[in-house]
């Protein structure tokens, strides 16, 4: 994953674990499981997701919604709750020794899949420590997370936000879905039974990044166990890389791809190396029945503040536990503005409102914005352009050009009544390199409520006609509202193109946010330069008169006599 990730990967894998909850004497009742973060090995302290505890709450999940409740004592759950924590080898427990003790795929679920122990499986299987019993110290939440969640998601009934660990069409009871929604933002602090002294290193396992120290666009590493306690030999501490896409106080979003079971897993920074930034609150987010490709996080620092406060109140005689919780990383600056976009080029993204329609845009000159035709479709229409950086401003503008609906290039140009002071003008790229890291900045998902989001990926394809680029494809997550936003090179910061659309399967209705299309800036730059210098729209008008091969590309059609069948 690159040299910069080495230290973070080691910390993540040392801190990752899986937590299982079951009922005493009821093995047939099944179990609940999630991922967790080892905060301290001696004594053993683990922070995990609170959703697995809702079946055990004496008063039901309604206890999690009481106003002013930031924590619940461990005895809020029934006496038949049994907890176990499992992790991989520690530094004092080499993989070789564990491999000798636990031959092959050691969990029953893996054996039931037909993965029999043997030399090949032993080489691939992950050595594990035996599950250890644990005690629930308290359930805790971050009030600020819940407040921001209610503001951003609570009243959005029309868009039907969906956070359960399944697709919207899957069979999930209303009661189960309500329990999962109530448990969002709730976590649990556990004390793990002590193991062999030789394996225990006293003190915190991780350091914690202060709230606001990681800015939008910063690289993140998520570590969790897909499907929880199922087959940890294979899935324990699976890594996923992404960036901090957006932030509202302690409520964070990342485009790192996480699966059900990774709830409670840790999310770590590349710089400072291995600092714990957040825990996974919901690995799958759906909006209007479409997967948005983002993971919901809760910042770790405020959670640990609640944990210290709660331990002092619930366990006055256990002050040593509070002391052993990880401290914030003092080398990280505090109090960075939460709306800081990080990379300076990202500030060129703006929100464009045209009547009841809104989308994204990019500043290409102090008084010139480019967006999509379907965002601002009528020439001479007045639009309102919002910029979030360096400060929130709104400036009126007029659509001076919009391509015709028959044009394959979905483009509109807005002339502003005033200059957008302080907004950097991006450098247009002259060349494109397939495979290079790229970023999309746009107002999809939240619109103006939370500022622009940043998603990362690679330039997966450059489609050319007669040797000239006419379409760019990326693996960045692109959502409704991102249309018209900029596509940047993550390395150079150069403007590569204008986001036009993601992909939708008309047969199934499924949307694929990680397959999307952008208009290369090289198609637009000569005409934009001509208009900016002379006011002449002639170059832009040429976008309405493209060749048939370009139209074929943007219709996503091939000039074949027979459409090839999929072999899948």
Curated annotation (Swiss-Prot):
Pfam families: Trypsin_2. Keywords: Hydrolase, Peroxisome, Protease, Serine protease. Induction: By the proliferator-activated receptor alpha agonist bezafibrate. The keyword Phosphoprotein does not apply. It is found in: Peroxisome. The record marks 110-111 as: Cleavage. Inhibited by N-ethylmaleimide (NEM). Not affected by leupeptin or trans-epoxysuccinyl-l-leucylamido-(4-gianidino) butane (E64). Residues 332-568 are annotated as: Serine protease. Its main location: other. Self-cleavage gives rise to an N-terminal 10-kDa fragment and C-terminal 49-kDa fragment upon import into the peroxisomes. The full-lengh TYSND1 is the active the proteolytic processing of PTS1- and PTS2-proteins and in self-cleavage, and intermolecular self-cleavage of TYSND1 down-regulates its protease activity. It is an enzyme of class 3 (hydrolase). Its EC number is 3.4.21.-. Belongs to the peptidase S1B family. Peroxisomal protease that mediates both the removal of the leader peptide from proteins containing a PTS2 target sequence and processes several PTS1-containing proteins. Catalyzes the processing of PTS1-proteins involved in the peroxisomal beta-oxidation of fatty acids. Homodimer. Forms a heterodimer with the C-terminal cleavage product (49 kDa form). Forms a heterodimer with the N-terminal cleavage product (10 kDa form). Interacts with PEX5. Interacts with LONP2. This is Peroxisomal leader peptide-processing protease. The gene is Tysnd1.
């Amino acid at each position: 994953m690159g040299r910069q990730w080495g230290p973070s990967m080691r910390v993540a894998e040392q801190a990752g674990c899986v937590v299982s909850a079951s009922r005493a004497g009821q093995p047939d009742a099944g179990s609940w499981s999630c991922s967790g973060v080892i905060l301290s090995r001696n004594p053993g302290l683990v922070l995990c997701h609170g959703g697995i505890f809702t079946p055990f709450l004496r008063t039901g999940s309604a206890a999690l919604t009481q106003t002013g409740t930031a924590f619940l004592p461990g005895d809020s759950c029934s006496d038949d709750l049994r907890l176990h924590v499992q992790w991989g080898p520690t530094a004092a427990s080499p993989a070789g020794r564990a491999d000798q003790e636990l031959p092959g795929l050691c969990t029953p679920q893996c054996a039931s899949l037909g993965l029999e122990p043997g030399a090949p499986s032993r080489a691939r299987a992950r050595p594990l420590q035996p599950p250890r019993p644990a005690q629930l110290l308290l359930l805790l939440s971050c009030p600020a997370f819940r407040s921001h969640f209610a503001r951003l998601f609570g009243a959005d009934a029309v868009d039907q936000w969906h956070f359960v660990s399944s697709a919207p069409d899957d069979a999930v009871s209303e009661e189960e879905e309500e329990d999962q929604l109530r448990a969002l933002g709730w976590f649990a602090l556990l004390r793990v039974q002590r193991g062999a002294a030789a394996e225990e290193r006293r003190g915190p396992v991780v350091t914690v990044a202060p709230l606001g120290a990681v800015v939008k666009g910063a690289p993140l590493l998520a570590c969790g166990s897909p499907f929880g306690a199922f087959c940890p030999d294979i899935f324990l501490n699976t890594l996923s890389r992404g960036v901090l896409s957006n932030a509202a106080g302690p409520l964070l979003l990342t485009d790192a791809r996480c699966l059900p079971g990774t709830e409670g897993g840790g999310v770590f920074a590349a710089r400072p190396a291995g600092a714990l930034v957040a825990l996974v609150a919901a690995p799958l987010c759906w909006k209007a029945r479409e997967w948005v490709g983002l993971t919901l996080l809760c910042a770790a620092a405020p959670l640990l503040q609640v944990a210290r406060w709660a331990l002092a109140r619930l366990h006055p005689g256990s002050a040593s536990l509070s002391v052993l919780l990880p401290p914030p990383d003092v080398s990280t600056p505090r109090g960075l503005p939460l709306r800081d976009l990080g990379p300076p080029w990202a500030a060129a993204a703006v929100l464009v409102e045209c009547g009841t329609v809104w989308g994204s845009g990019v500043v290409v000159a102090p008084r010139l914005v480019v967006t999509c035709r379907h965002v601002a479709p009528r020439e001479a229409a007045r639009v309102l352009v919002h910029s979030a950086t360096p400060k929130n401003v709104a400036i009126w503008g007029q659509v001076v050009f919009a391509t015709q609906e028959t044009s394959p290039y979905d483009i509109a140009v807005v002339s502003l009544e005033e200059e957008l002071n302080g907004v950097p003008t991006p450098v247009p790229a002259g060349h494109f390199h397939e495979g290079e890291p790229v970023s999309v900045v746009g107002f999809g998902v939240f619109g103006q409520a939370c500022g622009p989001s940043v998603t990362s990926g690679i330039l997966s394809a450059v489609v050319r006609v007669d040797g000239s680029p006419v379409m760019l494809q990326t693996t960045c997550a692109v959502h409704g509202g991102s249309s018209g936003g900029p596509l940047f090179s993550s390395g150079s910061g150069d403007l590569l193109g204008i986001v036009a659309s993601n992909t939708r399967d008309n047969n199934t209705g499924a949307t694929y946010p990680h397959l999307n299309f952008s208009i290369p800036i090289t198609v637009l730059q000569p005409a934009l330069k001509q208009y900016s210098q002379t006011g002449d729209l002639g170059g832009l008008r040429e976008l309405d008169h493209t060749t048939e091969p370009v139209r074929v590309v943007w219709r996503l059609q091939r000039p074949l006599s027979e459409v090839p069948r999929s072999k899948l």
